[in-house]
Amino acid sequence: MSVSVNINNVTKEYRIYRNNKERIKDALIPKNKNNTFFALDDVSITAHEGDVIGLVGINGSGKSTLSNMIGGSISPTSGNIERNGEVSVIAINAGLNGRLTGVENIEFKMLCMGFKRKEIKQLMPQVIEFSELGEFIHQPVKNYSSGMRAKLGFSINVTINPDILVIDEALSVGDQTFTQKCLDKIYEFKEANKTIFFVSHNIRQVREFCTKIAWIEGGKLKEYGDLEEVLPKYEQFLKDFKKKSKADQKAFRKGLDEKRFIVK
């Protein structure tokens, strides 16, 4: 299978300011030193056609930062990401404008993706039918529940038939019937040899669905490999982590975060 996504030594840094004075000083003095947070640090992953890669890790590890970078909404500070094909990101609120109705969001998002109005008109009924939103499709998205927003976002993205699909916790909300319908659609994409990045805390879904695992911990790629090789290690880590007291869990997270801050 040919390479669909190549993530090369990607790092994402954020300057941390305690107040506006520090922010202004940093802007005026290029070599000014300040606290820098590494959301991701030197991550490299190669994905091929047909790969379904589970991005796993505890909250705050950097999974969503990586998924947004794959989708193109965030640029790396260093390194690069090569994508061979159209990419769609499915996340709660991803690409949705709360002031627009469901229909208007469909039109707007598809126009941004390069679809012509005639094509949008042809695809619109499919999106609406898949979403199961009924008359709510004509209401402003700001009035939607998180589950309804996820339904709309998922429906748009699967209808446009992307080559590379990034799913960031979008199946963690909504009813079970719709979630199963989404999973069935994702299986179709898997059978069509599309590349899928699947961000989820649902280990059962990850085990059922993914072929490879990228374990992100403290902004670094701890392990990347076949599902059978990496997932058991991550599951054991979760078991051990959950046995810790709340104080020990907090200390563990704090230890990881401290390593991600440097002055530069």
From Swiss-Prot:
Residues 24-243 form the ABC transporter domain. It is found in: Cell membrane. It catalyses: ATP + H2O + teichoic acidSide 1 = ADP + phosphate + teichoic acidSide 2. One of its GO terms (molecular function) is ATP hydrolysis activity. It holds the Pfam family ABC_tran. Its EC number is 7.5.2.4. It is a peripheral membrane protein. Keywords: ATP-binding, Cell membrane, Membrane, Nucleotide-binding, Translocase, Transport. One of its GO terms (cellular component) is plasma membrane. It comes from the Bacteria. SMART domains: AAA. The keyword ATP-binding applies. ATP binds at residues 57-64. Belongs to the ABC transporter superfamily. Teichoic acids exporter (TC 3.A.1.104.1) family. This is Teichoic acids export ATP-binding protein TagH. It comes from Staphylococcus haemolyticus (strain JCSC1435). The lineage of its organism: Bacteria, Bacillati, Bacillota, Bacilli, Bacillales. The gene is tagH.
